[in-house]
UniProtKB/Swiss-Prot annotation:
Catalytic reaction annotation: a CDP-1,2-diacyl-sn-glycerol + H2O = a 1,2-diacyl-sn-glycero-3-phosphate + CMP + 2 H(+)
Compartments in which it is found: Cell inner membrane
Record GO biological process: CDP-diacylglycerol catabolic process; phospholipid biosynthetic process
Enzyme class: hydrolase
UniProt name for this protein: CDP-diacylglycerol pyrophosphatase
GO cellular component, as recorded: plasma membrane
Protein's membrane topology: Single-pass membrane protein
Chief place of localization: membrane
Stretches of the chain forming a coiled coil according to its record: none
Pathway: Phospholipid metabolism; CDP-diacylglycerol degradation; phosphatidate from CDP-diacylglycerol: step 1/1
The EC number(s) this enzyme carries: 3.6.1.26
Family designation: Belongs to the Cdh family.
Alphabetic keyword roster: Cell inner membrane, Cell membrane, Hydrolase, Lipid biosynthesis, Lipid metabolism, Membrane, Phospholipid biosynthesis, Phospholipid metabolism, Transmembrane, Transmembrane helix
The gene coding this protein: cdh
Length: 249
């Protein structure tokens, strides 16, 4: 009976997730890609005007776009087709280090806010294939939830230079955490670190969500959560962010 019960529960969960996925796809999952490829890039190349993006860097291969959700949230996106964390391009050495580029783009938040925002209040996040609403690669540049900030501060000494479970997880979900220096983050993509250092991750990159947060000792913590349908975890690292930016109040 127990096995049957677990099987039925799994079926219900999978059906529910499929329903969520269908609902997401109904809202044009290519909207961001259309904005980047049909508006931002052509406008920059033809008129030297990045609108509706805030910035377009064709040679570097990325754009920065003001998201409509929240007063300070921005997105960093490639100028070419990459769907998301499942893309094999992200573990190729010639692919731009999008997380490092996104960290540089945090200055747009301060410009919008009208004064400098402390690095400790900023986070970067990308959702997994099951945890996203859009099928064009995008890193969320936004404020960090105050409770997540407090939890990361409490666990500062427990974060290793190896991928290890973060004590207590975050937002009710299990996370792996890894400490990196600013130099390491600048030189090596977090996607590469995850794929090369976590067993079996390379074959299942699309099931992972990733986040980057600055720590009080000036290091960075990389955070990764993997889809787990039985635990109701769709792997949406955006859950650690607060697009209303309570942390600044």
């Amino acid at each position: 009976m127990k096995k049957t019960g677990y099987f039925l529960l799994a079926v219900v969960i999978v059906a529910a997730v499929a329903g969520i996925g269908y609902w997401k796809l109904a809202a044009n999952p290519n909207a961001l890609r259309d904005i980047v490829l049909q508006q931002c890039v052509p406008n920059q190349l033809q008129q030297q005007n990045p609108a509706p993006c805030a910035e377009v860097k064709p040679d570097a291969g990325y754009v920065v776009f003001k998201d409509r959700n929240g007063p300070l949230q921005y997105l960093l996106m490639p100028t070419y087709r990459i769907n998301g964390t499942e893309s094999p391009l992200l573990v190729e050495p010639y692919t731009p280090n999008f997380f490092w580029l996104a960290w540089q783009a945090r200055s747009f938040m301060s410009q919008k806010y009208g004064k400098d925002i402390p690095d400790s209040a900023i986070s970067l996040a990308i959702n997994s294939r099951s945890g996203r609403t859009q099928n064009h690669f995008h890193i969320h540049i936004s404020c960090l939830r105050p409770d997540v900030r407090a939890q990361l501060d409490d666990n500062l000494a427990k974060v290793s230079t190896r991928w290890l479970p973060l004590p207590g997880g975050l937002r009710g979900n299990e996370y792996l955490a890894r400490r990196v220096t600013e130099s390491e983050l600048a030189q090596r993509s977090p996607f590469m670190m995850l794929a090369e250092e976590v067993p079996d991750a390379r074959e299942h990159m699309g099931s992972y969500a990733l986040a980057v947060v600055r720590q009080s000792d000036d290091s960075f913590v990389l955070l990764a959560t993997q889809r787990n349908l039985l635990a109701f975890n769709l792997a949406s690292a955006e859950e650690i962010q607060d697009h209303q930016c309570e942390i600044l109040q």
